[in-house]
């Protein structure tokens, strides 16, 4: 049976499983004790989260605790308020919103989080990384899980009342190891909780508190076996060696941390409990790793990134070129900083596909067209000329060629490119012919366009169409 105090207070772990009201001088908390002790007048964190799962005994002193979880098993997270309501002056709303995430602990995997989660999505269609067990949870309102953000859930709760959320983690740590030959050590995850209160507009976007802990997830019953193995190893150590390790505690206290980078500070529209909002609305960012900043629609463009670009200019350039998911990674990078990054650097940070694409975009590398041809207009007395396309010098005596870049290699594309070059409607060009042997006119088909030699030169000759409202274009071989 779970024991709950009538008044939420600051709880701490004890290796017997009970909760003490005073801060214990545990080795892992020695560095934090002065700032958490209420006697010295320091600020207590407004909230505290306790994961009801035992910590590993094989963790050295002054290292972060590690907790083993079983895949798919429901674990309770107790949501506690540290201060009495009379002292809770910075909480001006009855409800707060918490977002629980399962994220990578390793920095290397954080850089490629989007690619890692997308790969997991494709290998496990229809599954989620994190779920909330609603029937077991107590005191939470409006629980939601985005269909596109598989590793996060959110809900509302009242800090003055008993509240606990039961979570289930469905991915295991070895699913993200680079080599899978058996016996690999799984990568550690983090359970992070970010809590927000309402702002003046009623949105839950004002950050209140964040905390996290380190976990590893095993196949069903694997966490129990691992915990037993660690305990047996510690029992074999000498008393002197045991002093270098933390004792195992039956619960895990999440330690304060910075908010997750993609926290929706301004762009959150989750309704309050009294608001009848859309059931499909969801306050989380629709992507998996990038921040959701309020950005105005930006025009599409292939502009080059300049070394003189400021940090803000670099962020806007990333948005314009479809790299929004990496804006949080490059939040402090100027244009010069990005230009100094090598291809290998960007691949390591963004993953192979996006890293190469970002490198090409930064270096201004354009996609080479499938075919390039050069055209020049021929003027004769008995022809209806197209509007003149003059060169920069304005000298009409020169036969100036213009490049036409073809991608689809079709007659329609060729017609549209010629019409665009001479600023006439495409429907005014009725037919396109190529002058063949003995001056015959051959209809230009898709197959003929596909067999043009790259960088061929043509002189455009025009004939008046029979309907008197357009032209026929004749392609003559140029020099």
UniProtKB/Swiss-Prot annotation:
GO terms for molecular function: DNA-binding transcription repressor activity, RNA polymerase II-specific; RNA polymerase II cis-regulatory region sequence-specific DNA binding; RNA polymerase II transcription regulatory region sequence-specific DNA binding. Its main location: nucleus. It holds the Pfam family SAM_3. Residues 43-280 form the Grh/CP2 DB domain. It is found in: Nucleus. Keywords: DNA-binding, Nucleus, Transcription, Transcription regulation. Disruption phenotype: Approximately half of the mutant mice die before weaning and show growth retardation during early postnatal stages. Mice display defects in the morphology of the submandibular ducts, abnormalities in the maturation of renal tubules and abnormal composition of saliva and urine. Leads to a decrease in the expression of pluripotency genes (Nanog, Oct4, Sox2 and Esrrb), while resulted in up-regulation of some endoderm (Sox17, Gata4 and Gata6), mesoderm (T and Mixl1) and trophectoderm (Cdx2, Eomes, and Elf5) markers. Signal peptide: none annotated. InterPro entries: CP2, SAM/pointed_sf, SAM_3, TF_CP2-like, TFCP2L1_SAM. Residues 261-365 are annotated as: SAM2-like domain. Residues 266-292 have a biased composition (Polar residues). Residues 1-52 are annotated as: Mediate transcriptional repression. Disulfide bonds: none annotated. Residues 219-248, 260-301 are annotated as: Disordered. The keyword Zinc does not apply. It comes from the Eukaryota. One of its GO terms (cellular component) is membrane. Residues 221-245 have a biased composition (Basic and acidic residues). Highly expressed in placenta, testis, small intestine, kidney and stomach. Low levels of expression in lung, mesenteric lymph nodes, muscle, ovary, and thymus. No expression was detected in brain, heart, liver, and spleen. Expressed in eccrine glands in the palm. Expression is prominent in both kidney collecting ducts intercalated (IC) and principal (PC) cells. Also expressed in the thick limb of Henle and connecting segments of the nephron. GO terms for biological process: cell morphogenesis; cytoplasm organization; determination of adult lifespan; epithelial cell maturation; negative regulation of transcription by RNA polymerase II; positive regulation of growth; salivary gland development. Forms homohexamers via its SAM-like domain. Interacts with Mta1; which is indispensable for Tfcp2l1-mediated self-renewal-promoting effect and endoderm-inhibiting action. Belongs to the grh/CP2 family. CP2 subfamily. Transcription factor that facilitates establishment and maintenance of pluripotency in embryonic stem cells (ESCs). With Klf2, acts as the major effector of self-renewal that mediates induction of pluripotency downstream of LIF/Stat3 and Wnt/beta-catenin signaling. Required for normal duct development in the salivary gland and kidney. Coordinates the development of the kidney collecting ducts intercalated (IC) and principal (PC) cells, which regulate acid-base and salt-water homeostasis, respectively. The Grh/CP2 DB domain is required for direct DNA-binding. The Grh/CP2 DB domain is essential to maintain the undifferentiated state of embryonic stem cells. The SAM-like domain is required for homohexamerization. This is Transcription factor CP2-like protein 1. It comes from Mus musculus. The gene is Tfcp2l1.
């Amino acid at each position: 049976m779970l024991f709950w105090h009538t008044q939420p207070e600051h709880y701490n772990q004890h290796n017997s499983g009970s909760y003490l009201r005073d801060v214990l001088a545990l080795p892992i908390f020695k560095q934090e004790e002065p700032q958490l002790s209420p006697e010295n007048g320091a600020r207590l964190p407004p909230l505290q989260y306790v994961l009801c799962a035992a910590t590993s005994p094989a963790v050295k002193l002054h290292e972060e605790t590690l907790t083993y979880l079983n895949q798919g098993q429901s674990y309770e997270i107790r949501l506690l308020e540290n201060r009495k309501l009379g002292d809770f002056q910075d909480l001006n709303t009855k409800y707060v919103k918490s977002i629980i995430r399962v994220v990578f602990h390793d920095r290397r995997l954080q850089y490629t989080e989007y690619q890692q989660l997308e790969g997991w999505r494709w290998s496990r269609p229809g599954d989620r990384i994190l779920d909330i067990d609603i029937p077991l949870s107590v005191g939470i309102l409006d629980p939601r899980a985005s269909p596109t953000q598989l590793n996060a859930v959110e809900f509302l709760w009242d800090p003055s009342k008993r509240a606990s959320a039961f979570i289930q983690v469905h991915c295991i740590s070895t699913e993200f190891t680079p080599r899978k030959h058996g016996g690999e050590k799984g990568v550690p995850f983090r359970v992070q909780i970010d809590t927000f209160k309402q702002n003046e507009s009623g949105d839950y976007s004002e950050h209140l508190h964040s905390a996290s802990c380190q976990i590893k997830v095993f196949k069903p019953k694997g966490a129990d076996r691992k915990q037993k193995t660690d305990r047996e190893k510690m029992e074999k150590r000498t008393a002197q060696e045991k002093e270098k390790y933390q004792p195992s505690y039956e619960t895990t206290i999440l330690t304060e941390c910075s908010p997750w980078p993609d926290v929706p500070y301004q762009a959150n529209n989750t309704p309050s409990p009294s608001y009848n909002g859309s059931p499909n609305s969801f306050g989380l960012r629709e992507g998996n790793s990038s921040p959701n900043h309020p950005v105005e629609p930006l025009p599409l463009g292939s502009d080059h990134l300049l070394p003189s670009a400021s940090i803000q200019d670099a962020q806007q350039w990333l948005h314009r070129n479809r790299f929004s998911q990496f804006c949080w990674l490059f939040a402090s990078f100027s244009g010069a900083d990005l230009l100094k990054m090598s291809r290998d650097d960007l691949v390591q940070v963004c993953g192979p596909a996006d890293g190469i694409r970002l490198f090409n975009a930064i270096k201004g590398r354009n996609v080479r067209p499938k075919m390039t041809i050069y055209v020049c207009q021929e003027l004769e007395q008995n022809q209806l000329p197209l509007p003149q396309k003059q060169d920069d010098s304005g000298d009409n005596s020169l036969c100036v060629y213009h490049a036409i870049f073809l991608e689809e290699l079709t007659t329609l594309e060729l017609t549209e490119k010629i019409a665009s070059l001479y600023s006439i409607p495409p429907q005014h060009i009725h037919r396109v012919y190529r002058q063949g042997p003995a001056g015959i006119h051959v209809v230009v088909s898709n197959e003929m366009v596909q067999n043009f030699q790259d960088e061929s030169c043509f002189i455009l000759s025009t004939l008046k169409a029979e309907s008197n409202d357009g032209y026929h274009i004749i392609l003559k071989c140029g020099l």
